[in-house]
């Protein structure tokens, strides 16, 4: 299980997209936009956008649309991006290092405080001035540095055990890149990220037309 949400996850997953697009509009000095214009750009119906935003009070004006800066600032607060969060990465392999090197997270308030691994040869390695440390010290580090989020980038064999350790140490949320769906207490936030899911979606779309041609042909044979 994971901590329950008040608003549906489908709505929550659309909010970062709205926020990202509004940020681009601000950079292009766009002052206002209608829900219809927003829907055309994002591939979501205008009705869906209004319904999503109404979960948080609604921000548009009849006949005017949305003030881009105001809506962006409101979504920043709704997403909790007006706050800062202390994070650690478990796993200093290629994926862990790639995430550690992604500076945009810090710009959004996610401050990387430590990186942990089981490989002694990696201890002391610095990635953007953040040192790789022994995983056996992680509980003490979490307590001393008030860590909010643990980012798991380790093989699935050790993922659940490591997640349990983080939870016992007081971690509030886990962003899991290990290829396994973890189980955590109801009061812990868990986001499982399976990178292969997106790639498999791409492969499906590449083959979709051919797939349905075959299915249509097989159906025609049966009917004949």
Swiss-Prot record:
User: Coiled coil where?
Assistant: none
What are the recorded Gene Ontology BP terms?
Answer: negative regulation of DNA-templated transcription; response to redox state
Q: Has UniProt tagged this entry with the keyword Ribosomal protein?
A: no
Functional summary from the UniProt entry: Modulates transcription in response to changes in cellular NADH/NAD(+) redox state.
Q: Which family does it belong to?
A: Belongs to the transcriptional regulatory Rex family.
Q: Where in the cell is it found?
A: Cytoplasm
Q: What's in the keyword line of the UniProt record?
A: Cytoplasm, DNA-binding, NAD, Repressor, Transcription, Transcription regulation
Check the record and name the Gene3D superfamilies matching this protein. Answer: NAD(P)-binding Rossmann-like Domain, Winged helix-like DNA-binding domain superfamily/Winged helix DNA-binding domain
Gene Ontology MF terms? DNA binding; DNA-binding transcription factor activity
Q: Which organism is it from?
A: Thermoanaerobacter sp. (strain X514)
Q: Which SMART domains match?
A: CoA_binding (SM00881)
Database matches in NCBIfam families: PRK05472.1-3, PRK05472.1-4, PRK05472.2-2, PRK05472.2-3, PRK05472.2-4, PRK05472.2-5
Q: Which Pfam families match?
A: CoA_binding, Put_DNA-bind_N
Oligomer and partners: Homodimer.
Q: DNA-binding region spans which residues?
A: 17-56
Q: Which InterPro entries match?
A: CoA-bd, NAD(P)-bd_dom_sf, Rex_DNA-bd_C_dom, Tscrpt_rep_Rex, WH-like_DNA-bd_sf, WH_DNA-bd_sf
Indicate which residues the UniProt annotation says bind NAD(+).
91-96
Identify this protein by name. Redox-sensing transcriptional repressor Rex
Q: Does the keyword DNA-binding apply?
A: yes
Instruction: List the record's Gene Ontology CC terms alphabetically.
Output: cytoplasm
